[in-house]
């Protein structure tokens, strides 16, 4: 891979993937939302080209891109948190933008399109998540991600380019959004507040953003056409244990309130990735321990 296009590159995975691609000598074209405050956090590097286009303007973006690109990674998505997940008109637009991203990949000469799906495509499941796990999403976000993955695969096949879809579990790391459990807990502890949680009995799989970026890079090089890969660490433990690790790394001895917040009506209680296909197909091997990942965020 020599020339890479990334939409929605300012989150934790996008940042880490940009850094990975640049370290491998790739030229990166990052398509960002116009006037995004997070653009300034992207690395300053001669190999990185920042292009400001809304997801609704991907047709225009091809005018600013070379015609000999290799892979397009599509992370761009609107309405990802809270009640916005059930903003159905916006979620439908996200599906359209995913198809637009496939067309952009084809127009720019890419041989491969890689989309970022979500564990939300599955709904509530007890057991490890694999590509073969039945998907019954229970919110508009998950429904749209599932539809986008399936429809973009058909569109890519029509255009003659490779299609790979990922279903991402819980990724954490530098530049993650402030409202995630990891980042909000760190911020509250640093501010001297007492963070509140559910009982934390959920069994959870966290993957560090740097490991996720390596997985995406390997998929760009070796991923199989038409496959769905579940992206996680393949290891899981109770959420309360992760919370205590964050506390011990940020502010040892600080008070945390477990069991104060009730579980949501559709609370996912078990989240663990089956990464056998990732290991077999591309040699993925996540190495960052959760404790070390938290240290990296704090140092950040």
Task: Name each model feature, range by range.
Residues 136-164, 190:
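Active-site Tyr-X1-5-Lys
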Residues 52-93:
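NAD(P)H-binding glycine-rich loop region in Rossmannoid oxidoreductase-like domains
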Residues 146, 171-183, 193, 209-210, ...:
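Glycine/proline-rich active-site loop of Rossmann-fold NAD(P)-dependent oxidoreductases
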Residues 174-179, 201-213, 228-248, 288, ...:
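Substrate-binding strand-loop-helix patch
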Residues 74, 78, 99-140:
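Conserved Rossmann-fold NAD(P)-dependent oxidoreductase catalytic core, especially the SDR/UDP-sugar
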Residues 83-84, 163-164, 170, 185-207, ...:
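A conserved pocket-lining segment of Rossmann-fold NAD(P)-dependent short-chain dehydrogenase/reductase
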Residues 199, 228-229, 240-243, 251-270:
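C-terminal "lid/loop" region of Rossmann-like NAD(P)-dependent oxidoreductases
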Residues 4-24:
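N-terminal Rossmann NAD(P)H-binding glycine-rich loop of SDR-like oxidoreductase domains
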